[in-house]
């Protein structure tokens, strides 16, 4: 019999005597899976299997006695030789009605290679989903002790063919041929004609040996012809839990294919993991430079028309009156006249300060406005008690205590790793310095000023001459002494941090975005802290707290004593312009632990003043920090305690779109990511110290690396809202952002921002490159 396509009809034909009892339901399960199950589990306990086929012999074949025709064409395509080879044998011995032939048959049809046990079933799997049919012919004492189960295909639907054969009224189904069950007018006869598939023709029935029996029977012995045909469409719900004989081994396999929904099973695919993919939206390639200038003028009115070209010249050549104390000036140093240098002229007019030239006046101005203007804490404070409490809290909130490493950190390997990171110039200086440890002065530092001025994103550049940043740094040999140890300690700290606490240590844009990937896309209350004069406001409390933290990770002995001594009372010298001064405490901005010490000073101070144990996310980097709490979480203002205990002046920002290290934290397509501040970027495009096309090419390479997120219009749309929220722009910045992207990602357009006519120079950026 041909296979019914599309799994339309699954059938079992049971022809039985008058006392046939089914002790369990007859069940057909079919679909596309999987498991080999016996068709007749145990028909009679430990009875031999005798299977008849459509060849010469039939079991129980005697014309003169009560006979039974166990004609069960199980497999249509089996030849006589195949039957013999498979031990599907024939028996011609006569049997009485009480010794009726027991017919059992196990048929398992699966696709190649899933679940099959040849030794158990004794025959090969029939390929191509051959016929699923069973004909059971039994005598009056036949009892089925187990259900008849058929499992085939690969999809999983369970259908009950015969729920209770004798408890329910059986259906007698005739077909459209000559014979009908009980088919004689004058006598009671039985025609065991039960076509498995309703569309079988007469020739098909004959060829399949679904034959008719014409032997006379009394009315009480009329053969009951039952036929159950179940047509299953691709249904969504089938209740299989009431069928107790469903093998337990199927459960694990079923759960991978089916989606459970209460007590039902939905036939659909279940994925063990899902990934949400969001495509980028291309930014329109349109825009002009006036679009950018118009938005900047509207957001920072007056900044673009200020004239500061001669500010540095005025400071260097005219008299300066100011009060200075606690310092010494030496006027015998080299005098350098002010120089006007040629450079490219930017098209955009912004408040980007000009690059300064070093001089004694600039050093004194910077030293007075920076180092001598730090606040001084008035009042008594139990530093040891404060440090002990904050470190205990840090162990619970910031770190996994079992990951804290206190082993020896001064090893050859750690020193070699630090040495490999040094530049060729630094290595040459270290080799040339032959001083012994006892000859090194750990308390004397060098002093210098940075020529680059940080741009301010407000209106103060119109009225203020910004002070330069000061750098206090030790000799190279001092950094070489502490560098490997501090580097190893910071690596241990990072390894022990909890996942929601982030130390932004030289992270790339992609690495920083990975730290916020776990955040769910609902709103948080963001706490953004802005410290003023952070480095210069440090006291002994900060230094002792950081050293106490480093002690937890192995800093001890002579290294601890020398490091502590080098941070307290120091003497600074400007060897170029003759400025000398004593400094008490303060963070030395040029030693090997400037960034790490600033980071952990801020983190420990905020931990002491804020409930960081309830925070969802904390990120610290230098004097910048960002903390996320639940929306609506009530937080008291920490500025008073920070000033009274930690000597820190601060402002707390509560913007709708928080920022960290010059980047906005934005939720885009349900995922949080850091996006660079476009207002600061536009301000930098007005710089006047770009010398030539080679420097411009370096800037272009850096922009393409740091601002690649701008290539997605969805990012620009979210960034537009953040700019309006923070800078109170009178209108949307989307036109300026689109114009900005149009010019910065193509060098031929980018050079128009600086009136440059040269060609792009491809080169590798220096590790310390900043613009």
UniProtKB/Swiss-Prot annotation:
Belongs to the ssRNA positive-strand viruses RNA-directed RNA polymerase family. RNA-directed RNA polymerase plays an essential role in the virus replication. Its EC number is 2.7.7.48. It catalyses: RNA(n) + a ribonucleoside 5'-triphosphate = RNA(n+1) + diphosphate. The keyword Nucleotide-binding applies. PROSITE patterns: RDRP_SSRNA_POS. Its main location: host cell. Residues 524-637 form the RdRp catalytic domain. Keywords: Nucleotide-binding, Nucleotidyltransferase, RNA-directed RNA polymerase, Transferase, Viral RNA replication. The keyword Transit peptide does not apply. The genome of this virus consists of three linear, positive, single-stranded RNAs encapsidated in separate virions designated RNA-alpha, RNA-beta and RNA-gamma. Three proteins (alpha-A, beta-A and gamma-A) are translated directly from these genomic RNAs and the remaining proteins encoded on RNA-beta (beta-B, beta-C and beta-D) and RNA-gamma (gamma-B) are expressed via three subgenomic messenger RNAs. InterPro entries: DNA/RNA_pol_sf (IPR043502), RNA-dep_RNA_pol_alsuvir (IPR001788), RNA-dir_pol_PSvirus (IPR007094), Virgaviridae_RdRp (IPR047310). GO terms for biological process: DNA-templated transcription; viral RNA genome replication. It comes from Barley stripe mosaic virus. It is found in: Host chloroplast envelope. One of its GO terms (molecular function) is RNA-directed RNA polymerase activity. This is RNA-directed RNA polymerase.
């Amino acid at each position: 019999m041909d296979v019914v396509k599309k799994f339309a009809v699954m059938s079992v034909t049971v022809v039985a005597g008058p006392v046939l009892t089914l002790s369990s339901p007859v069940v057909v399960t079919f679909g596309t899976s999987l498991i080999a199950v016996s068709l007749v589990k145990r028909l009679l306990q430990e009875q031999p299997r005798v299977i008849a086929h459509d060849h010469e012999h039939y079991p129980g074949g005697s014309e003169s006695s009560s006979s039974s025709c166990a004609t069960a064409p199980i497999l249509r395509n089996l030849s006589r030789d195949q039957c013999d080879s498979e031990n599907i044998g024939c028996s011609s011995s006569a049997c009485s009605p009480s010794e009726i032939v027991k017919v059992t048959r196990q048929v398992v049809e699966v696709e190649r290679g899933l679940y099959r046990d040849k030794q158990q079933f004794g025959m090969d799997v029939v390929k191509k989903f051959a016929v699923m049919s069973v004909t059971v012919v039994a005598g009056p004492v036949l009892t089925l002790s187990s259900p008849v189960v058929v499992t085939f295909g690969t999809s999983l639907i369970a259908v009950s063919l015969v729920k209770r054969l004798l408890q329910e009224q059986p259906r007698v189904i005739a077909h459209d041929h000559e014979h009908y069950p009980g088919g004689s007018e004058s006598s009671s006869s039985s025609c065991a004609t039960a076509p498995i598939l309703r569309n079988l023709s007469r020739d098909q029935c004959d060829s399949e040996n679904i034959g008719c029996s014409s032997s006379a029977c009394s009315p009480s012995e009329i053969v009951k012809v039952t036929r159950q045909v179940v047509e299953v469409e691709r249904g969504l719900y089938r209740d299989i839990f009431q069928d107790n004989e469903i093998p337990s081994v199927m459960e694990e396999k079923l759960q991978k294919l089916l989606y459970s929904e209460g007590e039902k099973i939905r036939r659909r695919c279940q994925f063990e993991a899902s990934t949400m993919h969001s495509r980028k939206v291309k930014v329109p390639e349109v825009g002009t430079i006036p679009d950018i200038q118009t938005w900047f003028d509207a957001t920072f009115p007056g900044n673009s028309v200020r004239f500061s070209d001669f500010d540095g010249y005025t400071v260097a050549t005219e008299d300066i009156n100011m009060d200075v104390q606690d310092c010494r000036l030496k006027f015998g140093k080299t005098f350098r006249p002010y120089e006007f240098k040629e450079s490219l002229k930017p098209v955009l007019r912004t408040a980007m300060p000009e690059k300064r030239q070093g001089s004694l006046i600039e050093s004194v101005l910077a030293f007075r406005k920076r180092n001598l203007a730090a606040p001084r804490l008035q009042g008594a404070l139990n530093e040891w008690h404060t440090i002990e409490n904050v470190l205990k809290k840090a162990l619970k909130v910031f770190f996994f205590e079992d990951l804290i490493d206190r082993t020896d950190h001064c090893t050859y390997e750690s020193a070699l790793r630090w040495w490999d990171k040094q530049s060729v110039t630094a290595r040459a200086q270290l080799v040339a310095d032959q001083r012994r440890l006892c000859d090194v002065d750990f308390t004397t530092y060098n002093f210098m000023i940075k020529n680059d001025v940080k741009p301010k994103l407000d209106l103060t550049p119109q009225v203020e001459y910004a002070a330069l940043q000061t750098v206090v740094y030790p000799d190279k040999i001092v950094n070489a002494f502490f560098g490997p140890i501090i580097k190893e300690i910071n690596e241990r700290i990072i390894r022990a941090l909890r996942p929601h606490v982030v130390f932004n240590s030289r992270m790339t844009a992609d690495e920083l975005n990975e730290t916020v990937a776990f955040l769910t896309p609902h709103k948080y209350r963001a706490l953004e802290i802005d410290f003023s004069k952070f480095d210069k406001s440090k006291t002994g409390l900060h230094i002792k707290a950081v050293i106490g933290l480093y002690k937890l990770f192995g800093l001890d002995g002579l290294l601890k004593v020398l490091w502590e001594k080098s941070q307290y009372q120091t003497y600074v010298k400007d060897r170029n312009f003759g400025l000398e001064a004593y400094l008490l405490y303060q963070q030395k901005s040029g030693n090997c632990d400037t960034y790490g010490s600033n980071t952990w000073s801020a983190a420990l101070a905020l931990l002491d003043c804020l409930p960081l144990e309830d925070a969802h996310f904390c990120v610290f980097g230098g004097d910048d920090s960002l903390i996320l709490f639940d929306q609506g979480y009530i937080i008291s203002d920490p500025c008073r305690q920070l000033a009274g205990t930690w000597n820190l002046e601060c402002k707390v920002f509560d913007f709708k779109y928080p920022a960290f290290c010059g980047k906005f934290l934005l939720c885009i397509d349900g995922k949080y990511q850091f996006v660079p501040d476009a207002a600061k970027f536009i301000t930098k495009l007005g710089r006047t110290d770009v010398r030539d096309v080679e420097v411009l090419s370096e800037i272009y390479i850096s922009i393409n690396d740091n601002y690649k997120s701008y290539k997605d219009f969805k990012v620009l749309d979210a960034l537009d809202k953040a700019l309006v929220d923070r800078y109170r722009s009178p209108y949307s910045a989307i036109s300026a952002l689109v114009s900005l992207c149009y010019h910065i990602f193509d060098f031929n357009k980018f050079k128009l921002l600086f009136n440059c006519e040269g060609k792009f120079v491809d080169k590798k950026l220096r590790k310390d490159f900043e613009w």
